[in-house]
């Protein structure tokens, strides 16, 4: 009888707690962006204030949307520039273009775009090999990972990026390099938390990893992709499945940075992907290129 009563008490406590857990996050609004104005849009990137959005149009042009003015401007018509474009801490946009030379080799060139003057400045000469745009709290720089490991501009401020199976963390002008977990295909999508104390990144075969500034693993968040810091305590990420040929589902997840909690922000059938965060908002696209702006309320 005593054992039976204990089970009943446990079930009763679970029943009382479950509504609280279920309501820890609420989607308060979901708005389609640029409906009837832009066609399919991919690779969205919000700035930290959440008032500007980068995206690639169907024809590959990199575009900038200003939420306040409700205006879209073309940054460049290069078809690959939007794949890794980013906002620097100076407000400029850093991106890489790609060209085929007379020798039939592919060359990449780094640029930055000033949204106020609408001027593009070339930062590097065409380079055969990988060129990566790196955003920091004070601006941005261009990196050439691999054998030609180099920077074309000194990296100032704080930031994080990946090169192969290494995560690079810049803190106060000092660059630190870590390989905290084994990964058969390297790391991707590194970002620094808003308070500058932790770095989240994706490791192939491991999922999302959170480390401190000494490279020590503080949390493993699960098999999700494309992590983005929502605030110092939560990240937003993509959870996609495929059949080896195409996506079969994709949704946006909210993950607590210590790995203790997670929640679905939409259904797997929504085919939502590539989330980005800034200024308390979340923007994502769908497999069909539909942009959405989401707002949530987290009950802490």
Please state what every model-predicted region is:
Residues 1-8:
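Bacterial N-terminal signal peptides that target proteins for export
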Residues 8-16:
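Bacterial N-terminal signal peptides
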Residues 22-300:
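Sequence signature of WD/YWTD-type beta-propeller architectures
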């Amino acid at each position: 009888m005593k054992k039976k009563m204990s089970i009943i008490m446990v079930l009763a406590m679970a029943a009382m707690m479950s509504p609280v857990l279920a309501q820890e996050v609420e989607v308060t609004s979901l708005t389609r962006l640029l409906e009837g104005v832009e066609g399919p849009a991919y690779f969205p990137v919000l700035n930290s204030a959440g008032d500007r959005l980068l995206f690639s149009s169907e024809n590959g042009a990199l575009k900038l949307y200003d939420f306040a003015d409700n205006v879209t401007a073309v940054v460049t018509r290069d078809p690959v520039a939007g794949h890794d474009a980013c906002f620097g801490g100076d407000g400029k946009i850093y991106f890489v273009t790609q060209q085929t030379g007379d020798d039939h080799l592919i060359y990449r060139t780094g640029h930055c775009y000033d949204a106020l003057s609408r001027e593009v400045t070339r930062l590097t000469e065409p380079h055969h090999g990988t060129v990566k745009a790196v955003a920091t709290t004070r601006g941005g720089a261009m990196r050439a990972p691999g054998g030609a490991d180099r920077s074309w501009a000194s990296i100032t401020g704080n930031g994080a990026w990946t090169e192969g199976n290494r995560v690079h963390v810049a803190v106060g002008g000092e660059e630190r390099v870590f390989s905290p977990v084994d990964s058969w295909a390297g790391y991707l999508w590194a970002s620094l938390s808003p308070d500058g104390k932790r770095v989240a990144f994706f490791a192939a075969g491991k999922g999302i990893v959170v480390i401190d500034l000494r490279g020590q693993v503080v949390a493993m968040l699960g098999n999700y992709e494309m992590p983005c810091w929502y605030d110092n305590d939560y990240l937003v990420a993509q959870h996609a499945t495929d059949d080896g040929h195409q996506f079969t589902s994709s949704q946006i997840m909210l993950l607590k940075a210590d790995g203790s909690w997670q929640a679905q922000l939409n259904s797997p059938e929504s085919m939502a992907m590539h989330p980005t965060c800034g200024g308390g908002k979340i923007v994502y696209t769908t497999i069909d290129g539909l942009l959405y702006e989401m707002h949530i309320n987290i009950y802490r």
